[in-house]
């Protein structure tokens, strides 16, 4: 019984890691933090259909939201 629980836990962690890794490697999902002005630094863009809206006017950081 203990082995089965351990395998389930490992499976869940692997899936979560894959999902998080996928989100960070390609694009930011809705509600995730993003950078409005990168100043030439490498940043992760928002996913297709989303735009980076700043928290307040002039802010460098924002959150990915639908157009």
UniProtKB/Swiss-Prot annotation:
Tissue specificity: Granular hemocytes, small secretory granules.
Disulfide bond residue pairs: 27-47, 34-52, 46-64
Residues the UniProt record annotates as site (May be important for binding to chitin): 32
GO cellular component, one term: extracellular region
One Pfam family linked to the record: Tachystatin_A
InterPro entries named in the record: Antimicrobial_tachystatin_A
Protein name (record): Tachystatin-A2
Superkingdom as given in the UniProt entry: Eukaryota
Function: Exhibits stronger antimicrobial activity against the Gram-positive bacteria (S.aureus (IC(50)=4.2 ug/ml)) and fungi (C.albicans (IC(50)=3.0 ug/ml) and P.pastoris (IC(50)=0.5 ug/ml)) than Gram-negative bacteria (E.coli (IC(50)=25 ug/ml)). Binds to chitin (8.4 uM are required to obtain 50% of binding). Does not cause hemolysis on sheep erythrocytes. Has no blocking activity on the P-type calcium channel. Has also been shown to weakly inhibit Kv1.2/KCNA2 voltage-gated potassium channels and TRPV1 receptors.
């Amino acid at each position: 019984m203990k082995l089965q629980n351990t395998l389930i836990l490992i499976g869940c962690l692997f899936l979560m890691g894959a999902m998080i890794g996928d989100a960070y490697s390609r694009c930011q999902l809705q509600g995730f933090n993003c950078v409005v002005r990168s100043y030439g630094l490498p940043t992760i863009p928002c996913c297709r259909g989303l735009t980076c809206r700043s928290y307040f006017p002039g802010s460098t950081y924002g959150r990915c939201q639908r157009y």
